Amino acid sequence: MIFGIGTDICDIRRLRATYARRGERFAEKVLGPQELEVFRYRLAKVEARGLSYLATRFSAKEAFSKAIGTGMRTPMSWRACQILNARSGKPEIRLHGPLAAWFEAQGLRAHVSVTDETDYAASFVVVETQET
C-alpha cells in the first residue's frame, strides 16, 4: 500500500549559483560519502555533468522527505539519505543511521526516479508499506 508520494523540481541554474558561492561545502552538506565520490568525478570531467548530478540528488532527497512526511526534519537529513545507482543504472535510495532505523521500523520501501535537462532536475518518489 502507498505510504506517501513526493516530487521535486530543482532549477540547476540556481543550484549552480549556490555552488559558485559556497563551493564544495554545499556539496558536502547535501551529499553522502559515496555520492560525493561520484559528484567529484563527474565535476572533474565535465562541470555541467557534476552540477546536474548534484541537482538530481538534491531533488530526490527533497522528494523523499515529502514522501515520508517529515520534510527535512529528524530523522531525515541530507547525508543520511543517498541516491546511488544500481549496476543496471537504476537509482536507489540508501539510508543510514537513525533514518534507516526509523524507515525499517515503519516497514517501508522506496522507489525513486530522477531526470534532468539543461536547466532543471526533477525527481519522483513513491514510498510503500511492505506486504506481510
UniProtKB/Swiss-Prot annotation:
Residue positions binding Mg(2+): D8, E62
Entry GO CC: cytoplasm
Transmembrane stretches, start-end: none
Swiss-Prot/TrEMBL cofactor(s): Mg(2+)
Catalytic activity, EC: 2.7.8.7
Annotated catalysed reactions: apo-[ACP] + CoA = holo-[ACP] + adenosine 3',5'-bisphosphate + H(+)
Biological function: Transfers the 4'-phosphopantetheine moiety from coenzyme A to a Ser of acyl-carrier-protein.
Name of the molecule in the record: Holo-[acyl-carrier-protein] synthase
Organism classification: Bacteria, Pseudomonadati, Pseudomonadota, Betaproteobacteria, Burkholderiales
